[in-house]
């Protein structure tokens, strides 16, 4: 099934004929298969591991270094993430480079005109399926300084670092704050700890600083989050392993504690698939007596999921908006 963006691209198949093609950005389907027959070659790059892991021909990472005669960028909902990815890629190609940018209007794709105008000619060439399609030709190669995109803030004795589109990138969010408040020195936490959906590394770094003896693993699907967590650990001289994983897809160990402020937004829609998988599979990933501890908006239907997977659960903290749930193996 094609995304709305790819449906618009199918109206312009002659543009892909006999050219090397790169698809990158928020690619979420197999439009590549639609153009392979007529294109010279097709490469796909994604910064999202949940998509990339499904297909052997999709490259995953933070920096896209793949060159192509025609690049197609799928706009994401985060303008700064788009700016980062577009300028990073354009900084390494030559004047005359062609690019198509496709995105949903509600995701703010119109702002690509202002973003890319300083670097070349951009024009809207189609509008359909509530999407806009733009053609861009590079005339002035941009300078890309990745350092300018970093944000940082102080959290007690920690320095937190984050790239665009990473959750809790500018300040500590209320849910994570409530979750962290449930840990104290008296817990004497030890053993293997997994911070799943680590974002900027706030939870994992806080626990590692408080409980030095834990063996910390942090995971996320987003390359920008993984890089953010690595830097947060490094800047605070903390040890930990950071891995790309779609829930438990790339994790084989068992843990004494799995802790998470799990995402329930997918792009600009709400989705629960990752959280459902987390709760359903967590018990099998815990050592005997191990604990799953998560924070969530109070309105979300997690109690039933926890009871189904674990048999019971406890609410160990709550506020007007959030609840912290604990379930033990």
UniProtKB/Swiss-Prot annotation:
Its EC number(s): 2.1.1.172
Zinc-finger recorded as keyword: no
UniProt xrefs under InterPro entries: DNA_methylase_N6_adenine_CS (IPR002052), Mtase_sm_N (IPR013675), rRNA_ssu_MeTfrase_C (IPR023543), RsmC/RlmG (IPR046977), SAM-dependent_MTases_sf (IPR029063), Small_mtfrase_dom (IPR007848)
A Pfam family assignment: MTS_N
Entry superkingdom: Bacteria
Subcellular location as annotated: Cytoplasm
Catalytic activity annotation: guanosine(1207) in 16S rRNA + S-adenosyl-L-methionine = N(2)-methylguanosine(1207) in 16S rRNA + S-adenosyl-L-homocysteine + H(+)
Keywords (A to Z) from UniProt: Cytoplasm, Methyltransferase, rRNA processing, S-adenosyl-L-methionine, Transferase
An example molecular function term from Gene Ontology annotations: 16S rRNA (guanine(1207)-N(2))-methyltransferase activity
Broad enzyme group: transferase
GO cellular component terms, A-Z: cytoplasm
Statement: the UniProt record of this protein carries the keyword Cytoplasm: yes
Main localization category: cytoplasm
Subunit structure: Monomer.
Function: Specifically methylates the guanine in position 1207 of 16S rRNA in the 30S particle.
Family classification: Belongs to the methyltransferase superfamily. RsmC family.
Name the record gives this protein: Ribosomal RNA small subunit methyltransferase C
Upper taxonomic lineage: Bacteria, Pseudomonadati, Pseudomonadota, Gammaproteobacteria, Pasteurellales
